[in-house]
């Protein structure tokens, strides 16, 4: 479940920027 959170965070940050 931690991987999902990390992926979501990275995805949101990467996509946002």
From Swiss-Prot:
Highest taxon of source: Bacteria
Keywords from the named record: Heterocyst, Periplasm, Transcription, Transcription regulation
Family annotation (NCBIfam families): heterocyst_PatS (NF047415)
Function per UniProt: Inhibits heterocyst differentiation; a peptide corresponding to the last 5-6 amino acids blocks heterocyst formation when added exogenously in culture. Controls heterocyst pattern formation through intercellular signaling mechanisms. In Nostoc filaments, approximately every 10th vegetative cell terminally differentiates into a heterocyst specialized for nitrogen fixation. Seems to inhibit the formation of adjacent heterocysts. The C-terminal peptide binds HetR, inhibits hetR transcription and blocks the DNA-binding of HetR.
Subcellular compartments: Periplasm
GO biological process: heterocyst development
Protein name: Transcriptional regulator peptide PatS
Effect of deleting the gene: Forms multiple, contiguous heterocysts with abnormal short spacing between heterocysts on nitrogen-containing medium. These heterocysts do not have nitrogenase activity. In nitrogen-free medium nearly normal heterocyst patterns are established after 4 days growth.
Keyword DNA damage included in the entry's annotation: no
Gene Ontology annotations for the cellular component aspect, listed alphabetically: periplasmic space
Induction profile: Transcribed at low levels in vegetative cells. Under control of HetR. Transcription and translation rises 3-fold by 6 hours after heterocyst induction by nitrogen reduction (before proheterocysts can be identified), descends to preinduction levels by 27 hours (at protein level).
Keyword Oxidoreductase recorded: no
Coiled-coil segments: none
